[in-house]
Amino acid sequence: MHRLALALLALCLATGAASAQSDWPTKPVRFIIPFPGGSFSDITIRIIQKKLGPRLGQAIVIDNRSGASGDIGSDVVARAAADGYNFGIATNSTHSVSPALNPKLPYDPLKNFAMVSLVGEAPYVLITRPDLPAKSLQELITLAKAKAGAVSYASVGPASLAHLAGELFSQMAGVTLTEVPYRSSAQSVLDTQSGRIDMQFGTMAPVLPHVLSGKVKALAVTSLKRAAVLPDVPTLDESGLKGFEASLWLAVVAPGKTPPAIVERMNREVRAVLADPEVVEALRKQGIEATPTTPAELRERITQDIAKWKKLAQETGISMDTEATGSIPAKK
């Protein structure tokens, strides 16, 4: 009799849990963004928010928790209640670069999160000063090889993805660049435009107007496919650096023990939103290409990225504490 009562209780609890998940969501859903308002992540999720809320039948509440290159907000997501009402935004910074370079990270990017879907990617643009005597990537490499350190490179933020892109370029091209550190990407673009700096990897949205106006030259983009907003600009991969990829990406994740049924539902809704032509166009205006995935595909992407940046860090000695040295040496 006691066993029968326990079995009935377990059945009731399971039925109740299944019912709660099938009725989800019954209240507003929180999205924790580990970066401030106006950031790449914030702009992207607010574009998604307009369509995702109505599809779920509940409001999407944006909660910006910035600090420590996104690590603080990501830790908040990892520790949040796994009840289906807390989701987070993951980026290269929080889920591949930091894990690869920071052994003291308070969260595990794979174990502490349930993967939902990749949302979008935004390649960097390799731009040069307008009068640099190089019209292609190969001409730039030839110029840099002619004299070590002759080509200057703007690096914004130590151990940032843009910094790692420069390290990867130097390594794969076999060149040595003179590194000039900047605190502001806006200032570095202006200095490239004025000729004070030879080249840099610039974020798509802010550099696009300068490229289209001819104030800087765009030699290549860092994605494996050409950017829709710059269809005539080749990728570094097709320009001779086979396999080069260093795009900004953004994804939706949840606390690790979030019920699979809720994760699957959120994945379906995010993918549906990213198929909406209005959303695709709004993202594209920000230099972002919609790139929805399955949870498994997102997990594989993060796993591969961590391995890539960890390998680069080991080979170059770069870390979260790296200070600009004035040059980026080629791999020997």
Where does each model-flagged region fall?
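N-terminal (or domain-start) structured segment
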Residues: 20-111, 150, 174-199, 210, ...
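Bacterial N-terminal signal peptides
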Residues: 5-16
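Stable alpha-helical elements in mature extracytoplasmic
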Residues: 40-44, 48, 69, 73, ...
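C-terminal lobe and pocket-closing loops
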Residues: 207-275, 307, 321, 329-332
